[in-house]
From Swiss-Prot:
GO terms for molecular function: 4-hydroxy-tetrahydrodipicolinate synthase activity. The keyword Lyase applies. It comes from the Bacteria. It is an enzyme of class 4 (lyase). It comes from Prochlorococcus marinus (strain MIT 9211). GO terms for cellular component: cytosol. The lineage of its organism: Bacteria, Bacillati, Cyanobacteriota, Cyanophyceae, Synechococcales. This is 4-hydroxy-tetrahydrodipicolinate synthase.
Length: 302
């Protein structure tokens, strides 16, 4: 980790927050809190916000709810940061429709996940992403690889073939390995901006060429994650390492069970009424919540 000179361009900044979706006591989307939360995330250092991704519970949101969330967040933050919409689906036609709609609503980009459950082969993945890119040619796209949730993975060689789509410019790496970043850089060079999809792997991934992170923990410690990124990117590696080590207990606690269950509990603990996750997700267990709160309290004393 001796140098940051090799980092690729960063089209959406370095710190993006995968924002939770707030629900009220009746389980309905609380758009007012969503707007306030988005502004808070900007104040805490986020360069961009991703709405309706994994952390935003997209599987249990209707398309109309997703559209209104995008409009709410975009209106709330204005041009201060980039706002990306999660538009992925395991139906190519549906993903195209969602991506085109996001562009119409003013999104600055779209996060498009590898299709889940139906497990297409690499040829199918190439056709899927190329079709989406061609349907919304003016909207920058971030491919999203998270095989632990989707059941399949896009190969770096497939990504390389997609690089002739001008609007496929970035990639969220959430396979859990730094080698994913290395393999992508070997295939695509610096043309593709790779973001870590795991807070705990942010610094290791930056050391091999990632430009930043799509973060969950930035809901709680955004300014510290931003400081870690800034320290590394300016060659202050020891300072970055100190942040990396200091924040590991929180990073681990936020993924001790299915995301976004812990981060919603963490937000409640610091005063944000974001509600429980929608079913079939369930609230955080009592002991895990107590452990998480202890970690947050200890970080606030540092």
């Amino acid at each position: 980790m001796s140098s940051a000179a090799h980092l690729s361009p960063k089209p959406f900044g370095r710190l993006l927050t995968a924002m939770v979706t707030p629900f009220d006591s009746d389980g309905k989307v609380d758009y007012a809190i969503a707007g306030r939360l988005a502004r808070y995330l900007v104040d805490e250092g986020s360069d961009g916000i991703v709405v309706c991704g994994t952390t935003g519970e997209s599987p249990t949101l209707s398309w109309s709810e997703q559209h209104q969330l995008l409009e709410t967040v975009k209106s709330s933050v204005g041009k201060a940061v980039k706002v990306l919409a999660g538009t992925g689906s395991n139906s190519t036609a549906e993903a195209i429709e969602a991506t085109v709609k996001a562009a119409e609503l003013g999104a600055d980009g779209a996060l498009v996940v590898v299709p889940y459950y139906n497990k297409p082969p690499q040829e199918g993945l190439e056709i899927h992403f190329r079709s989406i890119a061609n349907a919304a040619p003016d909207l920058p796209l971030m491919l999203y690889n998270i095989p632990g949730r989707t059941g399949s993975s896009i190969h770096p060689a497939t990504v390389k073939r997609l690089m002739n789509c001008p609007n496929i410019i970035s990639y969220k790496a959430a396979s859990g390995t730094t080698s994913e970043v290395t393999d992508l850089r070997m295939q695509c060079g610096s043309q593709l901006a790779v973001y870590s999809g795991d807070d705990g792997l942010l610094l290791p991934m930056m050391s091999v060429g990632a430009v930043g992170v799509v973060s969950v923990a930035s809901h709680i410690v955004g300014s510290r994650i931003k400081a870690m990124i800034d320290a590394y990117s300016t060659g202050q590696v020891n300072i970055a390492l100190a942040y990396h080590e200091q924040l590991q207990p929180l990073f681990r606690a936020l993924f001790a069970t299915t995301n976004p269950i812990p981060v919603k509990a963490a937000l409640e603990a610091i005063g944000w009424q974001v509600g429980s996750p929608r079913r079939p997700l369930s609230p955080l267990k009592k002991q895990m919540k107590e452990d998480l709160i202890d970690i947050i309290k200890s970080l606030r004393q540092i």
